Structures are given as C-alpha cells and as structure tokens.
C-alpha cells in the first residue's frame, strides 16, 4: 500500500510542477533533488532485492561502503551496468519533464505543493522506511528486553540417548515444497517432510539471512550481528566466545560433533564458528579432496551434493557402528544462487517452469533428491531408531532464476524433524523463526527448551509470537548482540605472529591481513574476505583524521609510504591518519611487538586526496621499480605499459588465464632490445606440461617447454622490427577451480609465471 501511495505522490508532484509551477531555478533544483532522491531510493531497493532477495538489509549497508566481490560476481555485472544506465536515463527524463513549461510565469503555491508531494513520496516509500530503520539500528544502544529474553541453557543434556543428523539445505526454503505452486518439484524430500514434524511458519529475521548467519541463528539462538560484515568472520579467532550454543552442549554431553560440506570451511569463518562451539571433526573441500572418488568432480563452490552426502553417509555408518554418541551436521551447496548446480547422479536434471527450463528449480529438484536418498539410507539402517534427523534451509533463497516465482508465494524457511525413536507426523503452524531451531532440537534430545533468543517450538513461545514487530525488535537488540563478541575497546600494545599469520591485542586474536579503525572508545576490525573489498580500498573510505592500524603484505602499502618494500611479500604494519602522518614497519621477527602511536598533527587535505587516489589504483595499473616482472606482487615494472591474459597474484606467482585472454601479452612502453635473452621462471598446468609453448616477439617465435614444477629457462631473441610486445600462448588451457576464489567461475590455466626478465645482450 505504501509503495502505491509513494508512486502516486511522486507522479502528482511531477505533473503539478511540470504543468503548473512555471519557471524558477531554486524551486526546480529543490524539486528535482527530492524527486531524484525518490528515484535513487527505489533503484537502490530494486538493486538490493536483485542481489539479496530481501530488500535493503545489513548486507546492503555493508556493500554500499565496500565492494561486492566473490561468489559469481561476474553474473551481476550486466544488471549493475543496466541499473546505472537506467538511473542516468531516468534523471535526464525527469529533468526534461520538469522543465517542459519553463517559460510560464512562476507560481509559488504550485511549486510548494509539488515539493511537499515529492517529500511525501520519499517518506512513504518502502526504501526510505527500510533505510531509516537500518540507520536507527546502527545508532541504538540496545533494547531493555534483550536481558529479559536472552537465556543461557544448561551446558549438558542429562542422560542423552539419541544421535543427531542435521542437514542444512542451501537456500532450500519451504516455499519450494508447495506442490500447487511448483508441481512435482520436490517429490522425494516432500514425502519425507510429510512423514515427520513439519514446522510450516519459520520466518527469516535480520541477521539470519545468509549461510553463516543462518547457522549461528539455528545453533546459538541469536542473529549474526558483528562489528564487521558477517561473511568476513574468517578473520576472527573465536566466534561469540561467551555464548553457549548447541554444539557446546552436545560436546559437554559426550557427543562427538562432525560437520561435512563441499565448500572450503574457511569461507565466512565456518571453521572458526564450529571449532569455537564444540565441533572437533570438520570436513570441507580441502579435507575431502583426498578421500572422494573423483576429486575433479566439482562446481564453483566445491564438491557436488551427491559427493558430500555420500561422504556424510559413510561417516554416519562408521559412527553408528562405533557405538559412540555423535552429531553429524552437513551443508549442501548445489542450490546456491544465482543459478545452482546439477549433480550428475540425479534422475531429474531439468525442471520446466512457465514453459521453459529453469536452472534454479532444476538444481532444487536435483538436490532434494540427493538429500532424500541420504535420509532414506539412514531410515533403512538399524541405527535409525536411535537417531533424530533434522532438515532445514540455512536461509531463504537469494536472487536466483526462481526468485520472482518464489516472491509470489508466502515464503518460509524449511524445518522438519524425523524421529527414529518416536515417529510423529504433524504439521505445526506455530509462528517461529530460525533462532528457534536449535532450542527445538535440544528439547527433543532431552535438554533445555531455550538457547539465547530461541525457544523450542514444542514447549516454548517464540519471539515471533511474542512481538508483532519481531524484525524491528531484533534490530533494536543489535548492540546487545554485538557486545556478546566481547571485542576490545582499545589497542595500545600488539603482537604480530609471523608464522601463524595472526595479530593479538587486548586479549583478542585476529587472522591477517587486518585493518583497524581506532577511536577513543572503540576498535573496529575490518577483515578481508571473499565478499569484502581489499583492505586498501576499505582504508580509502576512512576520513582524513581517522586513526588506523593496517597489517598486510608490505608491497600493498609500499607504493604509498615505503617504496623500498615494493617487492616484499612479508608482513608490514602501517599506522597513522590518511590526512596526517603515516608509518610503515617491517615485521622482521617471528613474534613482532608493536605499539600504537597516533600523532595529533595538522590534516593536509592534498595529502589525504593523494593517499586515497593511490589506494584506489587497481592492481593491474600499479607500477614498481624492478629489472624483471615479479608475479607474486600486484602490478608490473615501470617499463610495462599494459598486460593481459594473466590472473591475480598468488603467494608463488600468477597463472595465465585464458578466460582473460587467449594469450599472455606483455606490452612494454619502449621497443625491446634488438638482441636479448628472455629468462622465464615458470611452471605448466595440466596438459600444458612437457609440450611446446610458443613465445613470440614480433616475427620471431621460440618454444618453451615446462614441467609441473617451477624451472628457469632462457630463450634467445632477435628483434629487428623493434617489437615491444611479448606473447606467450599456452597450447591447452585447462578449465579448473584449482586455487580459485570460492564461488568464482573456473579459470582456464596454462602456465604459472614466477618471474620474467629481459636481458639486453646487444654488443
């Protein structure tokens, strides 16, 4: 309703100003500004919905001040460009319409009415309401009801008798199981859902809307609110250290806790969270690659669901035979947005909707088949009678190719339970949320019926029932929840552990690299993750007088303040203010002791602007002084004009990547010498090993043969045509996720370059 009202007020404002207000520069500028704000707000809402599927939320607030990288970001580039072009076009059209009758005499009354209507359209828009509530949540000091409703459970279950299998279905919300809306989409898992305790109204709250947040909510009974973006949790050394979560209780009660997934455990700090709360046995992409039947059978995120659930079944069987009390948690990935992935063992690899194939629906149909097969194996085993099986979505689906169809339905998360000890078939329509999942499971296992803000849906009352405005209530509790992290409020002395890649201060430990914003009463950690911008881009957003401590590889800060370290991949510590003084110190000991020293100096805005501009230089445009191309640092030597076909720097060097160019091309500013040696230190990937690799300069071509290990080879070139471009053409680029950033499309690797040096041998 408010959306229609805001649009009506917007149109009324445009029409009244365009046809009645007449010409006046001030009124035109004011009205265009407010109407433009309406347009920006609604385009932001549309874009946010596209990326998150949940409007303008915490994730969007973070993304507005950082970069969206990782996780299939390439698939969002075209929509992003489209949104930007639409914004320019709408602004141009709006200005043209408002000036249609600019030659008519000015009328103050109509101008004022148009401006008031424009202001009303902004105030009534859902985007403005969402942003207002989000900003309020950042500024509140907490909610007095938090202490009333936050409850810590007992640390043990008296006399536990049941094993637990807990399956997180990636984005596998209950909406998919509506057979009227999506006929025969989930027949296998839907049939199992109907055999158990099916909770039909599990809503999604703020801070529970992505995988690690959904896991925290379901096990600890709180949303994932942190003083940093939630997916950057991999940088912390402990996760809500004060909280008692489901895994802690299980471990204290004699359970061995296992977690199995196909993706890398480090992504979003799942390993840190699980290790912090009772899980001693973790299996992700790195751990599984040595035990799965086909290590090369992977998607962009890791191993397919059929592989992961096969390994989960092996774990279940072995643990059940051992007689040891255990919990086995597993997380699927094939239904990850934006398109999903199809396991090769599925019987149904295609699902049509609206008369055409839909990749996301197809992935859902396939994944639920794999999950159902896993559950049916457990049900058919002699150990089911001692087992509780839980199936839940980690969060609602984000913007995938099925999302517009999902939004036409009443959306809820999936949560159902199959009890081997006490079969029970019932659909429970009680209002609840994902924070209640862990408490409900704990209740069934014989423990308390509450964890944090979560309550058992079998014997307690959910916050979703207590508060009609439960989303706003949870946002009001955000400061209280952040305080549970027990983050330090000051930093004076700190220690950098060079071997463990950690920094410690005020009793807290963080993985490196790390950026800290330091104020009188707060230390704000800004980690680097797959979803966040590089730290130098985050630092570029600091105000001129903001105090910072930045721990990163030396070459990343050297271009600003320490040119002598431009080729160093060691750790360095920089601190200061972007508009004031900065220092860079080389970490030259295994245990390096540092102190903060922020000087209260005059702010130089020219220096500030220069620092910000330099921080924002993209990697490929960075230049350093060197007599060779060093590939394990960003940029290139000053003599290089541009290069292509080369992937990002890694600790050892860089791969060629045919996704970025069929050949490696390095164009120098000046012609290469008439006669020179080309010294190449490199290795080959896959089928490129032990094969001739063409290397060209002008009309002359040599061949290079590399093995799988790094070697140094010298080629002799004549350059009579004064060519300035070096071309290397790997013969058989291999599509692979080897060494890839999680969620990115596969790279096509050919050769791995460590160093290339041009040696002039002209007499």
UniProtKB/Swiss-Prot annotation:
Q: Which GO terms describe its biological process?
A: glucan biosynthetic process
Annotated EC: 2.7.8.20
* Lipid bilayer topology: Multi-pass membrane protein
What keywords are annotated for this sequence in UniProt? Cell inner membrane, Cell membrane, Membrane, Transferase, Transmembrane, Transmembrane helix
Task: Give the main localization category.
Answer: membrane
Q: Where in the cell is it found?
A: Cell inner membrane
Task: Say which family it is in.
Answer: Belongs to the OpgB family.
NCBIfam families registered for this protein in UniProt: PRK03776.1 (NF003000)
Q: What protein name applies here?
A: Phosphoglycerol transferase I
Which organism does this record belong to?
A: Salmonella typhimurium (strain LT2 / SGSC1412 / ATCC 700720)
- Quick one: which gene encodes this? mdoB
